[in-house]
Amino acid sequence: MGSSSFLVLTVSLALVTLVAAEGVKGGIEKAGVCPADNVRCFKSDPPQCHTDQDCLGARKCCYLHCGFKCVIPVKKLEEGGNKDEDVSGPCPEPGWEAKSPGSSSTGCPQK
């Protein structure tokens, strides 16, 4: 096998690998956007998901509160959201406390 044949084979294998990896990583993105995350982390939590397809229902895989989690997405105002509607993201889990200035759970049910 000549050096030019080897080069063509190597480049072809590299392209096939990149295309296959992109297909696995990408998947179909669900509607909505991930909520803003203004929490600073010293250490990331292990991921609970890698793509939107790992999440049930309408939930999206988003980086939130120090790790990737399945969360209810924020509605875009252009997609029929009400301008008075709170679109800051999902309410935190019970027991969550604001970890940075400006973080709050305004509009969430009280414990």
From Swiss-Prot:
SMART domains: WAP. Residues 101-111 have a biased composition (Polar residues). One of its GO terms (cellular component) is extracellular region. GO terms for molecular function: serine-type endopeptidase inhibitor activity. Antibacterial protein. Putative acid-stable proteinase inhibitor. This is WAP four-disulfide core domain protein 12. Residues 27-74 form the WAP domain. One of its GO terms (biological process) is defense response to bacterium. The gene is WFDC12. Keywords: Antibiotic, Antimicrobial, Disulfide bond, Protease inhibitor, Secreted, Serine protease inhibitor, Signal.
